[in-house]
Structure formats: C-alpha cells, structure tokens
Amino acid sequence: MQVDIIKQVRDTKPLVHHLTNQVVMNFSANGLLSFGGSPIMAKAIEEVEQIAAISNAVLINIGTLTSTELESMIAAGKTANKHNIPVLLDPVGVAATSFRRNAIDKILEEVRPTVIKGNAGELASLVNINLEAKGVDSIGDGNLDVIAQKVSEKYNTAVVVTGETDVIYVDNHLIHNGTGHHYLSSITGSGCLLGSIIAACLTTKSTLKDQLMTAVSFYGLSASYAANQENVHGTGSFLPVFIDSLSKMPQELTEGE
C-alpha cells in the first residue's frame, strides 16, 4: 500500500463522475467523500459529455441499467477516453440477463476502460467461463487468477476480481489481497463503493499497479478496522463506523493490532 496515493487523493479531492446505479448513489457518495474524493452523479444525456470532460475519473456501473442510461454511459466513457481521463467499468449483474450482457458488449465496443472491476461470476461471464451466479451476486469462485488474466487479455485493461481474496491483474502481474471483512458481503453497494475508491486513486500520480493495490487493500483494511470496534455488533452498526474509517490513514487503522 502506498500511503502517498491516499494523501494525494485528500489533497486534490478528485472529481469522480458516477454513472452508477440508483441503489448505491448515497452510499457511494458519502463513502467517497469520507475517503477524500468528490462525487458527482450526473446521468442525463444532455450533460454527461460536459461533466465527464471536467472530471478526474469516470465510473460506469450498470447495476440498475436502462436503455437511456446506456447511451449516457457510452457518451461519458468516450469523452473520458478522448481527454485521457481514467474510466472504471463495473459490469454489475452482467451474467444475469441478456440485456445487461448486450449493454456491456456495446460499452466495450466504444469505450476503453482503464480498469474492469467485478465479482468472479460477472467477470467469468465476460470471457465465457461457466461460473454460477445469482442475480448480481457470484456464488462460485472458480480460478480467479485465470479469470482476471483472461479478462485483461481480451479487453486490454487492468482487472480487479473481488472476493474473499481479491485478485488484481495489471501489466502481466497478479496481485492478491486478503484484507476485508465478511460484513462487506452482506451490505448492498459495498463493491460499488470500492469502485469509487479505486476511481479516486486512478487520478493520482503513481503506477496503475500501486493505485489498484492501495485502493483495494485500504478498503479492506478500513472494513476490518470498523468491524472490530466495540460498538459494532452487526452490519447495521458497522456501516457508519466503516464510513468513518475511510477517512483515516492506514497507520491509524493498524494501531493496536
């Protein structure tokens, strides 16, 4: 983990343009604000190109996708590519329906993502690996290393596969991350917020490898820190403490361990 990346985010407060799902907007916005970034949730086709052009990163998340939003996502992504602005693509539930899969195919035909992030089931679907999924959730793991590498090679992008052990594949390197807590898997939008944190880190002056590892490991560390506080007894009490923990520095999260 590179502490300087987190410091850069808090110094620059990067604007992250979210084209994300309705379920997680509030959680993603507050989590990113706590971390140090600045969220904007603009999806209207009339303004997405202008918003994307002034943003420091663009996040595309298809969790509650509509046909109108698909048009906006492609427009924002293409604008970001034109201006060399990093793009994170989160293909939420892509394995669930043909509508979602066709939408992701259209996005990837026109937009070059810097990073594709998803769970094992979602990313396995992108490379036609048969892995069981339930709605937007993965209920199998498969070989995450193989899935990450195949997605990276197919789309020429860095990849983050989330799970009990996260897998990052970037520049022909595999990285494994074991930080985190099982409460995250019981909270709607925890993976979506991770996308926001990654997007913020993509705006810093560092290598893509360090940006991804820092974002993923810090996020998991924040979760384990929050879960271990005396006033946390379940997911309901965990949530506000987790949001608070995202504003801390890594050394604060490991004190006393």
Curated annotation (Swiss-Prot):
Enzyme Commission (EC) number: 2.7.1.50
Sample GO molecular function, one term: magnesium ion binding
Top-level taxon of the source organism: Bacteria
Chain residues that bind ATP: K117, T162
Xref: SUPFAM superfamilies: Ribokinase-like
Keywords noted in UniProt: ATP-binding, Kinase, Magnesium, Metal-binding, Nucleotide-binding, Thiamine biosynthesis, Transferase
CDD domains tied to this protein: THZ_kinase
Annotated pathway: Cofactor biosynthesis; thiamine diphosphate biosynthesis; 4-methyl-5-(2-phosphoethyl)-thiazole from 5-(2-hydroxyethyl)-4-methylthiazole: step 1/1
Residue positions binding substrate: M41, G189
Catalytic activity of the protein: 5-(2-hydroxyethyl)-4-methylthiazole + ATP = 4-methyl-5-(2-phosphooxyethyl)-thiazole + ADP + H(+)
Pfam families on file: HK
InterPro entries named among the record's database cross-references: Hyethyz_kinase, Ribokinase-like
Required co-factors: Mg(2+)
A Gene Ontology BP annotation from the UniProt entry: thiamine biosynthetic process
Gene Ontology annotations for the cellular component aspect, listed alphabetically: cytosol
Function: Catalyzes the phosphorylation of the hydroxyl group of 4-methyl-5-beta-hydroxyethylthiazole (THZ).
Family: Belongs to the Thz kinase family.
Name the UniProt record assigns to this protein: Hydroxyethylthiazole kinase 1
Taxon lineage: Bacteria, Bacillati, Bacillota, Bacilli, Bacillales
Originating gene: thiM1
